[in-house]
Amino acid sequence: MAGMGRTAREGARALRLATPEQRTAAIQAMAVAIREDADAILTANAKDLARAEANGVSGPMLDRLALDAARLEGVAAGVEAVAAVPDPVGVATSRWTRPNGLDIARVRTPIGVIAMIYESRPNVTADAAALCVRSGNAVILRGGSECIHSNLAIHAAIARGLQKAGLPTAAVQAVKTPDRAAVGMILAGLDRTIDLIIPRGGKSLVARVQAEARAPVLGHLEGLNHVFVHAAADLKKAVEVVVNAKLRRVSVCGSAETLLIDQAAADKLLPPIADALIKAGCELRGDAAARAIEPTMKKATVEDWTTEYLAPILSVAVVDGVAGAARHIASYGSGHTDAIITEDAAAAEAFIAEVDSAIVLVNASTQFADGGEFGFGAEIGIATDKLHARGPVGAEQLTTFKYVVRGTGQTRP
């Protein structure tokens, strides 16, 4: 493991000094290799699925793990999308000239060596590799033991893509052991060779990484996402957005987990929204006010407001306007993604101002909380901390900066 850190440093230097065209070629070659290795990757995934089912995994958790031909094509297409994203390395984000003639530029640079610790989703292996190469960073990938065969098969394709482009395979390494001790070594910093650790998974994984890591951590908390239907909402729009936000794909972190209804119009808004959700197979758990309108709902507990279901279950609360919605979100949300449905521009602006989440949407589904949907090609996660990045983390967010100062012989008096 310690050797991985040292070779990753060498890989990071090679990526940093590579041309944008070389990095693009490597990412494109990764996508080609993933398609070429489709049979091997799907066979490996079948092994992971069989073991997961034998261990009692089912429902959304099994869905997160599963690949089929269509999903694998989506993985390859996602890698290609990253190749099409502008290369951020070396880009001057600002530039100015001082009165003494010094020319100063703020220039994007790679972070260095990134360690990615994640669970379940094998597509993260490809997304993280592509984004790190695009941003000039080396990466050490430590996926969960539940998808180790899938991850290693995808990594083999990625390594071949790097080789085809003439870049070192040390730039993207995968931890090949399921031993949990490997995570501890990464958290210890691998002899100070890791510049950033990114955890992506359940609350316990993120909490452990944040508590034990000796390197900086880019946090990705669970998606305790809310949709607030304001009194001035268009009812048809509200029904469509709420159903999509919850049920399009319940196992993603952008899935809505709580529905907030404005008490000023709850009697009108809640029944048709609840009816559409129930008909679509969603279980509703409401507070007293919500159940007074829709008695068929189960009673919501305090735990429901802080639970990322990742299942067709939705908590429902009636709140007092924008201020009440913002208070509920501040009390129970995770700072991930929250939305308002309204035709009132002032209410929308108030919601935007009051809700301090990484992503705030107006009249759109929370399922748009995705780097691909933001035009980033893919994402390495949704950062819920405020430093150093926030929201979908794409290639640009995986860079830092340096100041380049050009002079003509100036000395300081």
From Swiss-Prot:
Catalytic activity: L-glutamate 5-semialdehyde + phosphate + NADP(+) = L-glutamyl 5-phosphate + NADPH + H(+)
Any one Gene Ontology cellular component term annotated for this protein: cytoplasm
InterPro entries registered for this protein in UniProt: Ald_DH/histidinol_DH, Ald_DH_C, Ald_DH_N, Aldehyde_DH_dom, G-glutamylP_reductase_CS, Glu-5-SA_DH, GPR_dom
Annotated CDD domains: ALDH_F18-19_ProA-GPR (cd07079)
SUPFAM superfamilies per the UniProt record, alphabetical: ALDH-like (SSF53720)
E.C. no: 1.2.1.41
Cell location: Cytoplasm
Enzyme class: oxidoreductase
Example GO molecular function: glutamate-5-semialdehyde dehydrogenase activity
Keyword Nucleotide-binding assigned: no
HAMAP family the record matches: ProA
Family affiliation: Belongs to the gamma-glutamyl phosphate reductase family.
Descriptive protein name: Gamma-glutamyl phosphate reductase
Gene: proA
